[in-house]
């Protein structure tokens, strides 16, 4: 039996039992409710794991955090969990390979559609050259979105030699979940992704065709 717990509204209900809550900012926040329902005690270790999931999914409480999110964070602090340490370890601490990989992506960044779209990518060769570890690309797509006047940030990173993961972020009005769905993926209105094949240029053009349908 396959049980699916998810907070993505684009979930296709592929499990035998599906618990989908697209309002929840993180799967870990769904688990908190389940633990309470089944009267499972949330220990300090469990709270640390749940808080790690919430911090990474909300990018440090920046996206979709609710009052319940902050109430749980307060309870975690009362248990003695060092939330600032989780934040530093997951979102702030960088190694040299991470820095070099990000630098390559920023050097390639293009601003398209009158500056409303930021696009960049890294290659498998880039990862090998700098000695990157899994996850060293995290955060690149957010930087593109944070540039003034950018509405949509598009970032590609390799999935071995099979293709690319396209990550999409939007600032205000573009629904990137719909764009990801058109590419075979899914996600949230302002954060989504998909696995795609082709060259970075080919993938860029496919994504731009969908983005243009929503740009104002």
Language model features: what each stretch is:
Residues 3-5, 17-20, 118, 154-156:
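Hydrophobic/aromatic beta-strand patches that form the interior of the parallel beta-sheet core
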Residues 7-73:
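Short alpha-helices
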Residues 6-7, 187:
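Short, small-residue-rich loop/turn micro-motifs
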Residues 56-182, 187-216:
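Hydrophobic helix-and-loop "lid/oligomerization" segment in the mid-to-C-terminal part
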